[in-house]
Amino acid sequence: MNLLKHIFLEDDYDAYEGTLDPASFFRINKQEEIIASTVCEIGWEYSKSFGNAYICTSFLCFHSDDFKTRFTFPLAAVRKLERENSDNDTFTFDLSNFHSQIIHLRFKGTRQQSEFFCDRLVRQLHASLEDASSVGLFLLSLASERVCFSESANSQEIESIDLGLGSQFGYPIASSNTNGLINENNSKSWIQYLKKNGANFNLIQTPNFQKLVQSGIPNNLRADIWETCSGSLFPRWKSKGFYAKNIDSVINNRCEYSEEIEKDLTRSLPDYPAYQSPTGINTLRRILLFYSETNKEVGYCQAMNIVLAALLVYCTEEQAYFLFSQLCEFYIPGYYAKIIHGLLLDLTVFEYVLEHTLPHLYQKIIELDMDLKLITINWFFSLFIKDFRLDYAFRILDCLFVNGPRVLFQVALALFKVNAQGILNATDDSSVMKVFRQCFDHINQGTAADEKMAALGSRSSMCTLPQLFAVAFEYFDFITDSFVSAKRKEFKSSVLYSLRCFTKRSHLRSVYQTTLLSNTDLDLVYDAFINAIGENNICHGDVLEQKIDFNGFERLVDCAAPPLSVIREPLHYQRSKRKLFTRLYIWMKDGDSTETSLTFKRIIHGLERLKADIALHSEILCFQLYDLKRDGTLRTEEVVELSESLILLCCYEGDEKDEERLTVISEFLKSCFSGCQDRRSFQITMEDFQAIVDTTGLHATLEFFLKKLIDGLLGKLNAS
């Protein structure tokens, strides 16, 4: 009995199970629509399972009530669907797949639910017929298909399949004294399981499958199992050679991350022979360049090289590309983003979990005034690849791809638990780090070293990988993907807020000392600027030189213009807004019409000028704003545009002053054009403009107008 499960403060953890949306649970494209679902019993090869079935756009999915049995079948891989004759109203079907396996489906919902489910299943099967022709040829490229189901396959055909760099440079080999060694019997067990329960497109995962995974996956099947369980096999099949078609053109283009990637190539698994040779280095370079160029919102981040270098040991470039993409979308979203927000979020979730599952260890870390993230950041960032010897690291990746992101939390918790005594005896942070270093050393040395340490009486260091797995997956089995997902959602806003504050402080640290704006105003304009360009486009170098185009500037300042109480803004209103924003944009660039973008530095400088001169020189600022030719005169169209802008920002406040301002603006226009015979040749100088402003009392309206512009640039109106 797992007592921890019952004293865990979050004792309603069972309520989280099933809260994960089906697309995330089955790791299928978020664009897949869940068309129908029903309660269902499935049977195959003397096995049965009861749970829920789902029809998606391209898949038939199932999970048992305890979530320990599941499958995700592409509808295109279904060969036949036949209804069994039944004396009652039970809906029972036999489904045949490409491996000639028969899956019995018995729908247990209401008659109406079952009829609807069957109707939609037949419809989607018909819709998938176009893809069915490509399934057979694609499956023949998979090692699992050749090993388990191809009658004509021989050793030469199997060896001809590309099994990653390991087929050329060797796979990591477990030492002979290591428990859980992947031997011939293990390979036979895998082949027997796959023949009985299906492989690749037709794999049914059961509790026995989980046990096999923990014992290790054979080298020739590892890439297939990773792809199938992660869901990356399906987008790779549907891509129809996307990687091969585009790799050459993409890597021949200049990549902004080339220098960073080049520096990290030789640091990626430096002890593995492939990355001491041009073949391995070139392979890794190609996929890193391709991924960063085809996922520009992510780009390149350190630790990508380590994870992809590991995947390439067993995978082709194409397999590794889709597998890593799936990893980043469904397992560790945001880990390798520009601000690694996903990594920081998971470290926060782990801190919460440690506090509530092993509170005595968490309290010890607090007493030592130690930042928990210093211990765990490399574990999560590199998926433990840097901490365990390579064959063990792949065993953890096996569990991760099959069971989901909870594995990272379970293994990390297990490391704390098996080292509990050493942590409690620690006197400072360095001694805690030493405890973990020694633990990794002993695990990586294998069983013989562990037995020697146990003989010396060191119980806390006595641990093998199978023992660590037992603690992780049995003692902490209540940590589920649904639980992790729920906690990610719970902490996401606070983590992002803290991250934004930290990023802002680091970006503006030097600017605070030099700007004429107050710290509050600088914070506001920074927030408005970042909202306009989007957080994914932040330049983490010199933020002052970060650029924004006119469309982004329009989003930034649009909040200065009050929304009208109509469904659609009148066309003249939209034109007036765009003209105003164009004037302000060019004025912010100091009239430089050749420059296509505006830097954050120039926005700050423009705001400084506006705020400094608004009270005493509002008429001068407004004149300069519309004197784009910089010849000291305003022409007819410029005076009219100024008047339209004043009406736009000053006469839609919804109070009694709207009418007063409109009257003053009308008087201003009359005074400007009184006595003018030909408006095409009309010009007004700065001095004449100031005189008319004084005569008509327009100064207060100009000042109000500029304040509204400033509020728009600072984002104050959006904030309110």
From Swiss-Prot:
Main localization (coarse): cytoplasm
Residue span, GRAM domain: 20-85
Entries under SMART domains matching the protein: GRAM, TBC
Keywords: Cytoplasm, GTPase activation, Nucleus
Compartment list: Cytoplasm; Nucleus
Gene3D superfamilies named in the record: EF-hand (1.10.238.10), Pleckstrin-homology domain (PH domain)/Phosphotyrosine-binding domain (PTB) (2.30.29.30), putative rabgap domain of human tbc1 domain family member 14 like domains (1.10.8.270), Ypt/Rab-GAP domain of gyp1p, domain 3 (1.10.472.80)
Gene Ontology, cellular component aspect: cytosol; nucleus
Matching InterPro entries: EF-hand-dom_pair, GRAM, PH-like_dom_sf, Rab-GAP-TBC_dom, Rab-GAP_TBC_sf, Rab_GAP_TBC_domain
Protein's GO biological process: vesicle-mediated transport
Any GO molecular function: GTPase activator activity
Segments forming domain Rab-GAP TBC: 216-404
Protein name, per record: GTPase-activating protein gyp2
Organism of this sequence: Schizosaccharomyces pombe (strain 972 / ATCC 24843) (Fission yeast)
Gene behind the chain: gyp2
